């Protein structure tokens, strides 16, 4: 049955590829047809579809589908987490930010990295010991199942939806530039492949797609950085001096402070990036794919190492682009601007240091990056619906594995259709605020509930519900009333909320709400929930009673 379904999906994909071929000869303004990129892209897709077929034969149970049976090693999971987290926005966006702003780009990239020590020291071990498939398992461990799982699932789905839209729109624009494909074709293609990986291969296929993508991206970025350093005699001093001579801003690119207009926005952005990371459902879900808490800690250790190394490379790549791309008229259009915009700086650098073949490789890696991220997001969204809402809220924990998996796969299909539709709908919208909003909601709803449920004995369901919903709604409302939506999209003269990011205030609302409505909860249920903290604490520390990986 699975093989027939995959063949059907393959046949559905063929007209899209044919349509893509037609599109290549049509609306191609910025990037010419790159045969190497197309060939490498097809090789990657073929390889990952084979992995999906292999994974589908090993995915028999609910545990296999959600967590790959808990049999992923710490090292493999670390690579997969890095593959899940290092998006095309990280690779192209941060190197472009360094290309335009210099040192500020490095500061911005650190925002994505500093959340990981929090996950390593405060969350990973306890999350693995207490949970099974989703972070809602942890949040609802000693609290009322229905309301907490409903809140956690809503928080997860909102974050997944916003992040997914941003990735799909980014994917369409990126592929349009890299391959010359029509935007709508690119979005449909990403959506179909995303559904295939997750529906048939589950977490096992998603994990290996992310691992392969991480290895390819790290290899490509390393090669680019080495070639940049080779061009300046492996001297950072020479790299920075020559970059200052070439860049329009001169020595100002070595100074911080030009990125954010005021300290409140800077603090709010930093808090959102730092604590939002610890509340992203597709990242937290990865800790259940390993056998125990020790492997979960190893996962974060390896992931942080890989990502730290990667963000260091983007800094070199950005300065390399200043040196080798900005001064080369071959990469400029008639107006003197970079062909394809500043986000193409890393792609042009690949051409400059490795020629057409390496340009094709990096283009294919950029596409692989998108597929790996959207696959992880889709699985997280599907598990929130099937495991948290359907199995535990609607069926009160009495759903069969077969029914739960059926609901999960239907959800994957629905998410695929929704992602494609919204990706097309939001084609011409500014999607930067969606990523910021996704991190802000994760920091304002998911993170406070997870961290407080694990560490504070006085938490009650009432406090978690009121504080969690208050944080989520505050983040959304402040984002709507802020400069990005209220002024730039809705067209009002001035914003009601003057800052770009809401996390500073929405997190405060969430934590105060959780604290106040918990300590004022005198109900008998609240007393029982507090009394259950000791048993939760023992399990979170020792792992006694924690779910284990299955052996195949």
Swiss-Prot record:
GO terms for molecular function: acetate transmembrane transporter activity; glycolate transmembrane transporter activity; symporter activity. The keyword Transmembrane helix applies. Signal peptide: none annotated. The keyword Metal-binding does not apply. Its main location: membrane. Keywords: Cell inner membrane, Cell membrane, Ion transport, Membrane, Sodium, Sodium transport, Symport, Transmembrane, Transmembrane helix, Transport. CDD domains: SLC5sbd_u4. Disulfide bonds: none annotated. It is found in: Cell inner membrane. GO terms for cellular component: plasma membrane. Transports acetate. Belongs to the sodium:solute symporter (SSF) (TC 2.A.21) family. This is Cation/acetate symporter ActP.
